[in-house]
């Protein structure tokens, strides 16, 4: 690898030493071409694009206004810029500079020669000339006599420009993409060989994007596919490498924004970003996001990437060591799903410079797969509660000012003996750890008398790390969580001390504290259930993290979200769609799912086709995971045990996909879960009984 880079560097140095004059000529030609494109876009009579980006073109030629500059004291010596009627050589210089330009530009520049006396605007690239007042009059006459012919040329140029856009061919587009790819690849090679600075490289990259299809201002009349265009995939990879790895420092924030915006208009021109996408023309900068690898993704390297990750999970953990919670996530990354490419995200809790160097080494592993590293890590989704913010304590009823309505930071059932799923849960003695009640499972004993004692029993399920502890083997469980109720009570008591004795406010706080005490005492007298089995272990390279709780017979157990829970953003989650009616064993990549956790409530996402690999508890593990969509939040601390659900397509009701056990602690956009099929299979292996989400039918 190093030798290859060294050879390239040597060739580049020889080329620079031998071809310097030619390079200078080429740069001048490119500058001239760029100026032509900018002016043609600006005067197109058939375009209705009012985008500020096009109105304020970045090309240097757009700094011309209606007034061409005059001789000024801003000049350091007798050398100054050719301007208006004050310089005789200005006209010839401008004609020479614009000889390869369209008639439109000549017309606009020549019109400026009549605006003598308007405010000065400095132009940096005009050739300096000697002040020779004696020739000004003759030059001005020459300009005036040529105005009519120039206007005719301008009209022809506009017509030719419009015709060329209409006659653009697919072959020409692919050729332009190939040229852009070659230019960007050369830039990236120079960066990796330290031939060019990142600042200069990103400027060159931006210029290349400006020169792409210069006569096409709006969208092309074709649809370019990432799956079929290797050049487009490589271009995307290079841009993402800039944005995610090379320009991460705050010093490059401006360059990063400009490149991202240019890339956005590039994708829009190729119809990879449509008007229906989330990115709008309101002036808000586009942003990179992560997306799931769905069933419709046919990118070439997807199968190979999946094989590598599968082999990685089979490696001996004794020869591997990494930071606790570090992970590798195969995803799609880009501005929109259609414009995204395969990406490997390396999450590390302690991100260092050497990790970015590792990305440079891995850059050439796949020609069209992006790689980047972020500060992130996998952690358990149980919550270690310290305190509850006081702003959630109470709200005043505007109708009756003397009444106070308190809103606890946890779900409360209307009937304490009918607890819906997704409520908060903790052990009776826990002081910090709290999670979510996933749902209810029922043993299917059949006619076997050996298990007849379990025939009418109901069992709740949650994550083992929420309810198992070394201090107690079979702890009692409380729903709602004892941890959340106790913390909420402390907040109210502390807040009540701020009001004088006998005040209406203090009385209201103390009444709510009394209500919480009554509920806690009732829960201790009417125990919800007791943990009878649980494990957190690696079984066949997969995490088995769940526990079953034998529910007291006085409680009515149904797998329903309940009517007493807080409102959902999805208006269809009503009536029959509140009930879990089916187990989903065949998970389809890209399937839309949601969960209702005790901490974050309702969040949605999509199933990823390839598993996530992570390092935890001294072992290499893998897990199915959900990518948050459309908002970049799926899970947080306190959501452990929440069921992953989906709306059924062929009938009313919900389908059970799995149970959440972990999430990425920094960005909280991934939710790791255990499929329901694996849970039921493991329960059958341990208990020798079949389990289901519906009670066993009599007889």
From Swiss-Prot:
Provide a Gene Ontology MF annotation, just one.
Answer: serine-type endopeptidase activity
> What biological processes does GO assign it?
protein autoprocessing; protein processing; response to amino acid
UniProt biased composition (Polar residues): 24-38, 83-93
Alphabetized UniProt keyword annotations: Autocatalytic cleavage, Cell membrane, Hydrolase, Membrane, Protease, Zymogen
Point out the signal peptide segment.
none
* The protein's assembly and partners: Component of the plasma membrane SPS (SSY1-PTR3-SSY5) amino acid sensor complex.
Quote the protein name from its UniProt record: SPS-sensor serine protease component SSY5
Species lineage: Eukaryota, Fungi, Dikarya, Ascomycota, Saccharomycotina
Please name the gene that encodes this protein. Answer: SSY5
